Structures are given as C-alpha cells and as structure tokens.
Amino acid sequence: MAQRIFTLILLLCSTSAFAGLFDAPGRSQFVPADRAFVFDFQQNQHDLTLSWQVKEGYYLYRKQISITPTKADIAAVQLPAGVWHEDEFYGKSEIYRKRLNVPVTVNQAAAGATLTVTYQGCADAGFCYPPETKTVPLSEVAAAIDATPTPAVTQTGETSKPAAQLPFSALWALLIGIGIAFTPCVLPMYPLISGIVLGGRQRLSTGRALLLAFIYVQGMALTYTALGLVAAAAGLQFQAALQHPYVLIGLAIVFTLLALSMFGLFTLQLPSSLQTRLTLMSNRQQGGSPGGVFVMGAIAGLICSPCTTAPLSAILLYIAQSGNMWLGGGTLYLYALGMGLPLMLVTVFGNRLLPKSGPWMAHVKTAFGFVILALPVFLLERIIGEAWGLRLWSLLGVAFFGWAFITSLQARRAGMRIVQIILLAAALISVRPLQDWAFGSPSAQAPAHLNFTAISTVDELNQALAQAKGNPVMLDFYADWCVACKEFEKYTFSDPRVQQALGDTVLLQANVTANNAQDVALLKHLQVLGLPTILFFDAQGQEQPQARVTGFMDAATFSAHLHDRQP
C-alpha cells in the first residue's frame, strides 16, 4: 500500500515537471486569443449565427469586427449595441463582454462559399491581441425567388457605427439659446413680438398670456427640431464621408467663417426677398389665437437674423457631422426653448424685466463667435493629434480671455478689477502650451522616446542579436491598436530612470500594426500571444524567459524589473 502511494506521488511530481518543461517561455497571466474569445458558428439554410464566448476580464471591439463573404451574397449585418469603453488614446469605443451573437442572413451561397470573420479584443489588464481571422465554410444555399442580389461587400462594425456624440451636453443648447436672446438683433424685438402674440390686447389674464407665449415658442421649437432631425438624418447617410480628413477640414473652415460673421466681419442671413415672404405669411396670422400664434412661431423659426444665423448654422452642421437624430432634434428644441424663455417673461411681466440695451449686447454676440470657434478645434483635433490640438485650444483661450480683458477695461463698475485680474490670469495660464512649443520646456530636454532599431522578420532579429556584440538586447512589440503600447511610450520609456537602466542595452522594436504574414511569423516564432510584450536577451543572444513582460508596467515597476532581471 505504501509503495502504491509513493508511486502515485512520484507520478504527480513527474507530470508537474513535464508540464513545466513544456510551458511557454515567460509564462503569461493572459490566455491565448482562442480561449479569451471562443468563436463558433451555426448555419440553418439562410440563417447563420456567429457567436463569441468572451472570457471574464476580456472584451471585443465592436468596430474591429469585419465580415467578408466569398462566393456568397449576404444581407447587411447589423451588429448589436455594445457598452461604452474609454481610454486615453482612442477615446470612447463600443465593446462586447461575456457573449456576442451576430445573426447573418445568407441570401445565396455557391459551392465552396466562405465567410471571412475578423475580430480583435483586449484584456482589462491592458493586454491586446492581434486581429484574429476565422474562415466559416457556408452550406450551399439557393437564392430566393424574390431576393434582390446585393454586391458582396465587407460588413464591419463601422457600417453600423453608433451616432457620434456632440462635444457638449445638449443642455448647453438651452443656455446658448438664452444667450442668443440677449444679442442686439434679438432682444430689442421681444416687446414687439410680445404685442403681436397677444394680438394687441393689453388686458389678458396672466395664464392666457403665458399660454399664448408658450404656444408661440413651441411653434418656433417645432421648426428648429425639424431642422435638427433633417440635418442629423442627412449626416447619418454620409457618416463615413463626414469623417474624412478633407471633409473635417472643410467643416472647420465653414465654422470659422460663421464665427467671423459673429465678429461683425460680414452679415449672414436669409435673402431679403425670402424674409419678406415669410414675414408677410406671419402677418396674415391672427394674434391672440392659439392656432395663429403657433403658425407665427413656426414661421419665425425660419426667419433668421444676422445674430442667429451663424450659431444656428454651426449647430446644424455639427449635428449633421455627428449623425445623431435623437440628440439632433433634442438639441435644437432646447436651443429654441432657450431663445423663447425671455419672450415668455416679457409677455407675462412686461418690459420691466428686460435689461437696458447697450454695447454689452454686441459683446454677447462676439462672445458667441468664440464659442463657435471651439467647433473647428474639436474637428481638427482628430486630424492633427493631441499635441497640436492642445496648442489650438491654447490659442483660442488666449484670444478669448485677452478680448474679455480688454473689453472689461471699459467698465466702470465696482469689483471689475477682480474680474480683470481673473481674466488676465486665465490668459496667462492659457498661453503656457504655446510658450512651451515656441521656446521649449524643461521637460522637453530629456529624450521623449528610446532610440529603437526597427526589425520586422525573424532573420532581421537573428541578425540584430548577432550584431549586439556581447550586449544585452530588449525587443519591444508595438502596434497602433495597442493602447498599453502607447502608454509604455508616453509614461514608461520617457522616464529618466528607465532610460538610464537601459543605457547598455541594444533596443529593438517590431511594429506589428499591419499584422501581415511576416508579423504573424515573428509573433509565432517568439510565442507572443498579444501586446504589449517585451522580450530580453542576454549577451549570448538567448532569451531570458523569466524577464519577459506582458501587459503594462509604469516607470517605477519597469525600472525595478530591469534591475532585477538576470544579467
């Protein structure tokens, strides 16, 4: 009996030893992609279901899912909505967790037809896998008699991309509308509009006057909401084209021109002939009656003054660029409601609530010009990157706070000195990014990045190891789709402690963004599951498995790792 127990213990120990012998070098805490994202499919005639079982702590990117038919015709693929995930470098993305099922309608499939499915995912711990590609064999399916053939195109997560978000909350549109009400083209008109809404009657109950004013505002809001829905619907049809850099640059130029019109460089409004026709239509309506007042409000929404044309055009263009219909209609409704609130107050309480007209109204108009100038920066930031985007924000901040400071010098009210100090301080703070760019900053004296030598194949790696001349070697795997790789560049490799620790190390880097055949071969040769992965080789060109790094490390942790690795 004792001999059997001893034999069993020996067998278990030997099994453990053999398992350790055949473990991958630098055992990783992360599982292979096939275990992180278990892919399966099932076809029943025209109905095909693609499914992924996503391991806990991992997720798939919605926009990275691509479905391409070969010798087959499929209907447009509608990917289900995911959950929002945000990171520093790529902003908001939709992801899938736990399980994903994608129904695909196969209109027709010839003999030997296949479906190529590409997907990509990451781990919450900051480890991303290269794009995975699976080939799904399709059963032969005859086309339905009434089916309309469609071209075989690639269906991706981008085709059903959710509507983009506006750079501001829709509630800000309410505040913008209220602000526009105090411009020189709008505020002086409110007493006149109030009299027209009431039908020239001076003695109406407060409730009746409030009801008529509310109906007028709702008529105006209906027009603006319809404009917002039309703009969003039009933008949704051309969503991909509206994200093209040339289109973004064109929109930025248009927004800049709209802002210049708010600065008084030129006047932007509807043609006078069209305004006259709309005014005549409005005058035919009977004031004091709910129906007539509603129509008057709806027509008033189309009559844009020089102060309202530019802000309205800017909001419409950005809504079209976002393609979000719900947000588009809601934003314009709140904008109209904001413009109508002062009118409702004037109608109920009279002119005594209105501030006196003066130069301050022109200043309000100019301030909204700066608000519109923020939109080109939002758009251009997608093209020129974070660094230049920060400089544009800096330039806009200096211009706005500088203008506000100069304007405040004309005021004689008590307490304006405090406001002037605050504005001047804000301008000085805003200029810092421009100052660092123009004259350099102390932090820029240290090299921002390590000096890597690029390699792309196994042969190039072997050659680089042979040329290391007895020095240790570090090989970093990088890809544009790897968020943690960018974090390594920005936070870890730029640290002086890390750079000092790597002073005598030969630095190699393999960029596997394309994930082509040679990239796959290199990853397979070195048994790299995903990114970021950093390998270390000794002076003889042999990898140090225990020193392998998978996943992100901050500068302090990575520096300690470099000191602890085997020589």
Swiss-Prot record:
Q: Where in the cell is it found?
A: Cell inner membrane
Which gene underlies this protein?
Answer: dsbD
What InterPro entries does the database record attribute to this sequence? Cyt_c_assmbl_TM_dom, DsbD_gamma, DsbDN, DsbDN_sf, Thiol_diS_interchange_DbsD, Thioredoxin-like_fold, Thioredoxin-like_sf, Thioredoxin_CS
Q: Which residues cross the membrane?
A: 166-186, 210-230, 246-266, 299-319, 326-346, 360-380, 387-407, 418-438
- Please list the disulfide bridges: C122-C128, C185-C307, C482-C485
Q: Which UniProt keywords apply?
A: Cell inner membrane, Cell membrane, Cytochrome c-type biogenesis, Disulfide bond, Electron transport, Membrane, NAD, Oxidoreductase, Redox-active center, Signal, Transmembrane, Transmembrane helix, Transport
User: What protein name applies here?
Assistant: Thiol:disulfide interchange protein DsbD
User: EC annotation?
Assistant: 1.8.1.8
Instruction: Give the taxonomic lineage as stored in the record.
Output: Bacteria, Pseudomonadati, Pseudomonadota, Gammaproteobacteria, Enterobacterales
PANTHER family hit by this protein: THIOL:DISULFIDE INTERCHANGE PROTEIN DSBD (PTHR32234:SF0)
